[in-house]
Design a protein with these regions (language model features):
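Conserved dinucleotide-binding and phosphotransfer motif residues
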Residues: 29-30, 78
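Non-catalytic signal-transmission and effector/linker regions of two-component phosphorelay proteins
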Residues: 1-11, 17, 24, 41-42, ...
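Conserved phosphotransfer microenvironments
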Residues: 59-73
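Charged docking surfaces used in two-component/phosphorelay signaling
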Residues: 21-29
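Two-component signal transduction core modules
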Residues: 56, 105-106
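Acidic, metal-coordinating helix/loop segments flanking the phosphotransfer/catalytic sites
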Residues: 24, 36-55, 63, 95
């Protein structure tokens, strides 16, 4: 996974190796740099060591331990202030009940185009919020 300073960095957190690799392949084909982790704990360690991330894209459920919601709560605010997009195959009604404020959601299964649209939307919202006077 190459890193280019001009390319936005998406951090993908997914316990399914195939899904994680496919997500990175899709994102890289659209011009993003992809970093990834197979667990919330691994993601937190990697983000702490190198916080250069433009969007966090994470599954919600992981076996044991912390969830994607926990990860969103830890990274969507200071010191990281990351835009977060969570994903799950669970019923949307359930997810809406547990989704933290300001965190976007993409229902599984999704197409590469839906993933790209969701990532760009999350990035655009964050830019608008960060613009003074807007």
């Amino acid at each position: 996974m190459s890193q280019n300073k001009d390319r936005p960095v998406v951090f993908v957190v997914e316990d399914g190796d195939g899904t994680r690799q496919l997500s990175c392949l899709v994102l890289e084909s659209y011009g993003f740099t992809c970093r990834s982790a197979g667990s919330v704990e691994e993601a937190l360690t990697l983000i702490e060591s190198d916080p250069r991330v433009d969007v966090l894209f994470s599954d919600i459920h992981f076996p044991g331990g912390l969830t994607g919601v926990d990860l969103a709560l830890k990274t969507a605010h200071a010191p990281y202030n990351l835009p977060v997009l969570l994903t799950s195959g669970l019923a949307v009604e359930y997810v809406e009940e547990i989704l933290p404020d300001g965190v976007a959601f993409l229902e599984k299964p999704y197409t590469p185009e839906q993933l790209l649209t969701a990532i760009r939307s999350v990035m655009a919202k964050r830019r608008v919020l960060a613009t003074p006077g807007v």
